[in-house]
Structure formats: structure tokens, C-alpha cells
């Protein structure tokens, strides 16, 4: 199953408001589409001034550092990631320093960083590279949920495409014949390193929440059986949401609607 499909079907991941430990609007758009069952919030949109130094030696260290820094401020679920481009011929550089690559030479824009990297790779035959992403979800007292995604590709000789951000215009996917910057966000979310990391994260989160989901399904089944007691399908509570209805009542009606559907299946069997 493709990463984006699993994430959309992961119904056991209960709704959360999650703060993204970044002020990058492109990352926000990607994670929002990868976790459609949750609301992803940027700190700046909530009036929070957030900054993390990102001075770790690994992707995980940087991601955890960002998650811890924002959680200390919001005390709510926090999603953080650190990613970078690792070029085989450069011994994995720029790696964890991808966002600051060339800063010592006065390079501070994505375009300038890509140009510097292409100059470093001029004349080299081995242009294999990887996009790596490590994402962490901090929920408080429970252990961190961690997901890692790797996407293999080839470094181009020139920039192509206008979508995406960072090094996307020079990262070519051989099996598609296009760079990340030439893919729509829906296409990118099927193959990207960030999508794969989000998939691992969702799987871990689903396993953590499985006991709660099973309790809910058991309650649902008991309600359905009560409706079919004696071989007769009994009506449940009305499910249509009415004006002025409280959120709790709406949830109860939604539960009974699901229970009735389950009861019909039992009755037919």
C-alpha cells in the first residue's frame, strides 16, 4: 500500500491538534496532506515565536531537539522532522547540514545552495544520492514516536521544475524521469522521504493507540448485538445532526449510526 493511502485510512489514529516544529510553509502543506485526519498547526500562526538551533550531529538529534523545544512552550502534541540530501560521491554531504550548506561562503538561498552543490559535482560520473527524513512525534510522557524515510535518486546537472522547495529541482527520480520539483504534491507524497517517514510514524502511532481503538470497536459490537437481540433488528438513536445539538450528542449519534450498520450486517448473517 502506498504511504499516502495508508495515512488516509489509518482510522485508529484519533484526531489531534499537532504543532509542527517549523515555520516552513512548504513543510506545513506536505504534512497537512500526509496527516489529513489531524490538524497541523504552525507556531507562527498561533502567535508563538519558535526557533531551534539544529546543531545535532544526526537527523534524529535535530528532530528531537526541535520537538523538545516546542513542546516546552505549547505542552501539546508536537511533530518535528529533520531532513537532508546525502550525495554518495561527497561521502554523504551535505547531509544534516543541507539547510546551512555553503553558509561559510555567504550562501543563504536554496538556489545558491543548489548551484554550489552542482559546481562541487561538476564532471563526476557517480551522481547517486538520497533524500533522508527522520520525523518524531512528541506526545508528552509517552516515548517518542519515530519514523525514518529514505528516497533514492540521482543528482541532475541543472535545475528543473518549479514545485517543492529546497533541493527538489536537482533531485531526479529515475523511474519517473522527473525531479521532485516537477511533481505535484499528491505525486510527491506517494514516493518522498517525508511521506515514508510519516508512514512509519503513523504505523507506530496506530500500534500505540490500538488498545483504545479495540475498546471502541468492542463497545460498538456490544451495541450492535443489543439491537439484534432475539433476532429482531431494533432501532437505535437518531443519527441526523440537529441545529443546536451539542458535540457530545453528535458523537453519540454518530456512534449509534455505526452500531446500526454493524447490527444490520449481524442481522443479515
From Swiss-Prot:
It catalyses: XTP + H2O = XMP + diphosphate + H(+); dITP + H2O = dIMP + diphosphate + H(+); ITP + H2O = IMP + diphosphate + H(+). Belongs to the HAM1 NTPase family. It comes from Treponema pallidum (strain Nichols). Pfam families: Ham1p_like (PF01725). Its EC number is 3.6.1.66. Homodimer. Substrate binds at residues 22-27, 83, 165-168, 188, 193-194. This is dITP/XTP pyrophosphatase. One of its GO terms (biological process) is purine nucleoside triphosphate catabolic process. Gene3D superfamilies: 3.90.950.10. Binds 1 Mg(2+) ion per subunit. GO terms for cellular component: cytosol. Its cofactor is Mg(2+).
Amino acid at each position: 500500500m502506498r504511504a499516502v493511502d495508508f495515512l488516509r485510512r489509518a482510522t485508529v489514529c484519533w484526531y489531534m491538534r499537532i504543532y509542527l516544529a517549523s515555520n516552513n510553509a512548504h513543510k506545513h502543506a506536505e504534512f497537512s496532506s500526509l496527516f489529513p485526519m489531524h490538524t497541523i498547526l504552525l507556531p507562527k500562526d498561533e502567535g508563538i515565536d519558535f526557533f531551534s538551533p539544529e546543531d545535532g550531529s544526526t537527523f534524529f538529534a535535530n528532530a528531537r531537539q526541535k520537538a523538545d523545544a516546542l513542546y516546552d512552550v505549547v505542552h501539546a502534541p508536537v511533530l518535528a522532522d529533520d531532513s537532508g540530501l546525502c550525495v554518495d560521491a561527497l561521502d554523504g554531504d551535505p547531509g544534516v547540514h543541507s539547510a546551512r550548506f555553503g553558509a561559510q561562503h555567504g550562501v543563504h538561498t536554496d538556489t545558491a545552495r543548489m548551484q554550489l552543490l552542482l559546481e562541487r559535482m561538476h564532471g563526476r560520473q557517480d551522481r547517486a544520492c538520497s533524500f533522508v527524513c527522520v520525523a518524531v512525534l512528541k506526545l508528552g510522557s509517552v516515548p517518542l514516536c519515530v519514523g525514518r524515510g529514505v528516497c533514492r535518486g540521482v543528482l541532475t546537472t541543472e535545475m528543473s521544475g518549479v514545485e517543492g522547495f529546497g533541493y527538489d529541482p536537482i533531485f531526479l527520480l529515475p523511474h519517473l524521469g522527473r525531479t521532485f520539483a516537477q511533481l505535484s504534491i499528491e505525486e510527491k507524497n506517494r514516493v518522498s522521504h517525508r511521506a515514508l517517514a510519516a508512514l512509519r510514524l503513523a504505523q507506530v502511532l496506530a500500534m500505540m493507540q490500538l488498545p483504545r481503538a479495540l475498546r471502541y470497536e468492542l463497545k460498538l459490537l456490544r451495541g450492535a448485538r443489543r439491537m439484534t437481540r432475539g433476532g429482531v433488528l431494533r432501532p437505535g438513536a437518531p443519527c441526523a445532526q440537529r441545529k443546536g445539538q451539542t458535540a457530545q450528542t453528535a458523537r453519540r449519534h454518530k456512534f449509534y449510526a455505526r452500531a446500526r450498520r454493524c447490527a444490520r450486517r449481524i442481522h443479515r448473517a
